[in-house]
Design a protein with these regions (language model features):
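Short amphipathic alpha-helical segments with coiled-coil-like heptad repeat character
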Residues: 77-79, 310-314, 374-381
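TPR/TPR-like (Sel1-like) alpha-helical repeat modules
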Residues: 257-280
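Terminal, low-structured helical/coil segments at or just beyond the last alpha-helical repeat
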Residues: 281-319
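Non-catalytic carbohydrate-binding regions of carbohydrate-active enzymes
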Residues: 240-247, 274-280
Length: 425
């Protein structure tokens, strides 16, 4: 039995009874959908009609495996990401062309890399990047809103904001009743400095899918609108709904900080760091906020200010050894390629001051570099880092080098040096 109720009046709009076999479940679904559309006199767009007519998979078992994997993804914890993967891989084994399952795997691998959770999945950053690329490539052969949402997230992580917004627009155009496009657009609008518009899109996503956990996105928009009481209430709900998701505590602490609720902020920071420790991450510092991708610096500073008021420390002190002096640093870098400890980043320092890089996501960028007095290496990419100039100091540690922010607040990374341009950057 199926019924459609008007929630504003409590009256029945439509009801019917159906009998079917399990292997006919998709045909039954199509029939129910068409009857609901008729009852509501809905005019579907051409794209929606096409998607209704075209099945994403003919395998009920693949669909069931996808749903089980997606349920774990929605909990957004390291353990649940690890649990999601076998189900999603099983969905693809049952139907190798199942685009939504490929998109879901691309999402899990990319976000695990983004959250520093790859160890929980048993892969390296390079492997996570490659799996993301491969599954997204498959997903975009027959795209779903989820595929465009994932592409949008990857582009925004590279500060390619216009392209990221275009992908979110494609997700919405493909299916106006799928929440993924609205969630992607809402997130982006907050990042580019339009939180009021972003809030509208996030609320739309929540109306379309009340079961998904969009509370972090809602609280994020409220926070950047400086509606800190609302943000704190939202994020408190989020921590109760999903106590294993550390970033819920992170944003709650920032909201408490802005509200001057010092004791609550302190205990929330402690819980946040406790959850980080479970996945092998050290205590968070204010310097780590530099890694948050915002187009507008004011949005990042608002977050940093809240966390500072919450008692988050500035950062770890630089090593008590001498940084490399200017001339030694210039000789070290000129005409050489630095490769990150993970092997995912490669940067070639051309002798003419040009800079060429490739990230673990496969994206590339160009920029300029220079050595200034005091032994500081300064670089400015075209896209990465929002095109902002950043300066660092360097330390030699055995066969490796460390580079730290110029103020000594935090190590940025470790790398090895190779002569020339072996990566053809």
């Amino acid at each position: 039995n199926a019924q459609l109720i008007d929630t504003t009046t409590g009256g029945h709009v439509w009801a019917d009874r159906y009998d079917s076999f399990l292997n006919d479940v998709f045909a039954l679904q199509d029939k129910v959908t068409q009857n609901i559309v008729t009852a509501l006199a809905v005019n579907l767009t051409a794209g929606e009609q096409e998607r209704q007519a075209r099945k994403e998979t003919d395998s009920p078992a693949a669909y069931d495996a996808f749903l089980r994997g997606w349920a774990h993804y929605l909990l957004h914890t390291p353990d649940d990401f690890a649990k999601a993967i076998p189900y999603l891989e099983n969905a693809i084994e049952l139907d190798p062309s199942y685009g939504r399952a490929h998109a879901a795997l691309a999402t899990v691998y990319w976000e695990s890399r983004d959250n520093y959770w790859v160890k929980s999945l048993g892969v390296s950053y390079i492997e996570a990047r490659e799996k993301t690329r491969r599954h997204l490539e498959e997903a975009l052969k027959d795209p779903t809103p989820l595929a465009h949402r994932t592409a949008s997230k990857m582009l925004s992580d590279q500060d390619r904001w216009d392209e990221a917004i275009a992908e979110a627009e494609r997700a919405i155009a493909l299916d106006a009743n799928d929440p993924n496009g609205y969630e992607a657009m809402g997130r982006l609008l907050v990042k580019v400095g339009s939180p009021a518009e972003g809030l509208d899109f996030i609320k739309k996503a929540m109306r379309l899918d009340p079961q998904s956990d969009y509370l972090f996105r809602l609280g994020d928009a409220q926070f950047h609108l400086e509606r800190y009481d609302e943000a704190a209430a939202t994020m408190l709900r989020a921590t109760k709904r999903n106590p294993g998701r550390e970033w819920n505590f992170f944003l709650l602490a920032a909201a408490y900080g802005q509200l001057g609720r010092e004791q609550e902020a302190k205990s929330t920071i402690e819980m946040f760091n406790k959850l980080r420790a479970k996945v092998g991450q050290g205590p968070y510092t204010l310097a780590d906020v530099d890694d948050w991708d915002f187009k507008e610096p004011a949005e990042r500073e608002r977050l940093r200010d809240g966390l500072r008021k919450a008692g988050l420390p500035e950062g770890k002190a630089a090593p008590r050894v001498a940084a490399l002096p200017s001339e030694e640093l210039r000789r070290l870098l000129t005409g050489t390629t630095s490769t990150s400890e993970s092997g995912g980043w490669h940067v070639y320092h051309a002798p003419d001051g040009q800079l060429f890089g490739r990230s673990f996501s496969g994206s590339t960028d160009e920029g300029t570099w220079e050595i200034i007095d005091g032994g500081q290496f300064c670089r400015q990419w075209t896209y990465w880092g929002g095109g902002r100039k950043a300066c660092f100091i360097y330390f030699k540690k055995g066969d490796e080098y460390e580079y730290w922010y110029a103020d000594g607040s935090r190590m940025r990374g470790k790398f090895r040096i190779r002569p020339g341009n072996p990566e053809n950057l």
